[in-house]
């Protein structure tokens, strides 16, 4: 599968070079420094954004017992902050012609959001989760439009459409990578983290008594393997467990989620360093 991907990528690049100005993704654009920086930033921010948007609702469903619909509605602070900051930053850029300060602030805010999420516990209050959501929405509102502006800033007018489509393409690809990578990290770690906590909890007599009750034993059927492992194909069993029995499962899930968000913070930090130290502090012309 990886070999097919590499061959496809190489073939695509060679074909695009051959097509020159008629290419879907003109290779000549990558000679422009601002465009290169824009694609890298869109890719890294896409990883963080889509990775967080994929895994945060899982936290709300598992740790807070929300339905998928309620979990989606609970993320409204992200959208509210996004829309507000997008409008404000757009006006400020139009007035001053400066975009770097908003870009750096946006990527920094997104990184702070990941760090807030990385400190979540299964009993964290919703207002604390909402703080992270506001940072994330504000960061995306400030970063997305300024990254696009950066990528367009040195591109000739005739290539503006191709440049805009290209940076959005890289953001989408970053999102695909982020969602896949974050979920892979989550489910590769969750099993072992849960097993460790269940093993510790099983040393307590009250936990063994609760787990042995008919309703809990039925819910755990097929979840706990004889070798001590855990099957995580479906987390719906948590809704049928006594809270005392569900606790080690929730702690294991959230522990794995914290690693996911720390990974997102690391990617966000890379984007922040690029934005702060590589992006020039230029002023856009009125044209």
Set out the residue ranges of the language-model regions:
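Transmembrane core module of solute transporters
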Residues: 1-2, 7-162, 265, 286-287
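Membrane-embedded alpha-helical segments of multi-pass transporters/permeases
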Residues: 10-14, 115-119, 184, 188, ...
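Transmembrane-helix exit segments and adjacent C-terminal regions of multi-pass membrane proteins
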Residues: 14, 214-287
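Hydrophobic alpha-helical transmembrane segments
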Residues: 15-24, 78-85, 196-218
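Loop-to-transmembrane-helix entry motif
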Residues: 33, 37, 99, 170-176, ...
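Small-residue-rich alpha-helical segments with characteristic i,i+4
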Residues: 52, 75, 129-215, 276
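Extracellular/lumenal inter-transmembrane loop segments of multi-pass membrane transporters
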Residues: 62, 94-95, 117-128, 158, ...
């Amino acid at each position: 599968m990886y070999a097919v991907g590499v061959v496809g990528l190489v073939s695509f690049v060679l074909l695009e070079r051959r097509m020159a100005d008629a290419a879907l993704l003109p290779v000549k654009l990558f000679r422009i420094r601002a465009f290169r920086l824009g694609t890298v930033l869109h890719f890294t921010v896409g990883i963080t954004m889509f990775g967080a948007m994929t895994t945060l609702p899982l936290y709300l469903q598992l740790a807070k017992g929300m339905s998928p619909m309620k979990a989606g509605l609970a993320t409204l602070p992200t959208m509210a902050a996004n829309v507000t900051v997008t409008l404000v930053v757009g006006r400020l850029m139009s007035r001053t012609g400066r975009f770097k300060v908003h870009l750096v602030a946006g990527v920094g805010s997104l990184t702070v959001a990941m760090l807030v999420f990385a400190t979540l516990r299964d009993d964290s209050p919703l207002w604390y989760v909402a703080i992270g959501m506001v940072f994330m929405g504000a960061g995306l509102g400030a970063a997305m439009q300024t990254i696009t502006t950066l990528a367009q800033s040195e591109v000739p007018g005739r290539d503006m459409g191709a440049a805009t489509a290209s940076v959005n393409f890289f953001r989408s690809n970053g999102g695909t990578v982020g969602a896949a990578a974050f979920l892979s990290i989550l489910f590769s770690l969750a099993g072992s983290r849960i097993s460790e906590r269940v093993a510790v909890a099983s040393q307590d007599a009250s936990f063994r008594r609760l787990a042995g009750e008919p309703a809990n034993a039925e819910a755990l059927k097929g979840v706990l393997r004889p070798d001590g492992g855990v099957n995580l194909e479906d987390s719906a069993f948590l809704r049928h467990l006594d809270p005392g029995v569900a606790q080690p499962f929730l702690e294991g899930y959230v522990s794995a989620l914290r690693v996911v968000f720390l990974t997102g913070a690391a990617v966000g930090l890379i984007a922040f360093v690029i934005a702060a130290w590589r992006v020039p502090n230029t002023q856009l012309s009125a044209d």
